[in-house]
Amino acid sequence: MTAAPPRVEQRTRANGIELAWDSFGDPAAEPLLLVMGLGAQMVAWDDAFCARLAEAGGHRVIRFDNRDIGHSTHLTLLGVPDIQALMAQAMAGLPLRAPYDLRDMAADCVGLLDALGIARAHIVGASM
C-alpha cells in the first residue's frame, strides 16, 4: 500500500460534545464509519488502510475520536472512573455508576452522522 496524503481533521458538535473526525474518499459515496475501541485514537485506523477502503470499496470512510480520546471533548469534570470499583460492583450484581456508557458512545456515533447529514452508513468497529 502507498502512503495516503495527510487528512484535514475537523470537529463537529454532536450529542452535546465536540467530536474530532476526518474522512477519505468521495463525500458523496456510500459512508463507512470506523469506530475505534476503548482508549485508542482514530489514527489507529491507519491512513493507508482508510484510503484503500475508500478506493477499493467506493466508500466515504469516516473515522473519529471517541469522547475522552484524542482531539474530541475530554470530560475531565466527570472524573476518572475507578475501574477496580466498577468491576467489583459488576461482580456483586450492583448497578454501575459511570460518567457515561456505551449507549452514550453509540449516541455520539449517531450524532456525528446526523451532523454530517448522513442517514445511513456501514459501521465497522474495533474492540479492545
Question: What is the role of each PLM region?
Answer:
Residues 2-18:
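N-terminal cap/lid segment of alpha/beta-hydrolase-fold proteins
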Residues 12, 53-54, 113:
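A generic structural signal for well-ordered alpha-helical segments
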Residues 88-121:
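Conserved acidic catalytic loop of the alpha/beta-hydrolase fold
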Residues 5-9, 113, 123:
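A contiguous binding-surface segment within folded domains or other stable secondary-structure elements
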Residues 17-91:
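Conserved HGGG/HGGXW glycine-rich cap/lid loop of the alpha/beta-hydrolase fold
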Residues 36, 121, 125-127:
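Conserved alpha/beta-hydrolase "nucleophile elbow" surrounding the catalytic nucleophile
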Residues 105, 127-128:
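Active-site loop->helix "elbow" adjoining a glycine-rich segment at hydrolase catalytic centers
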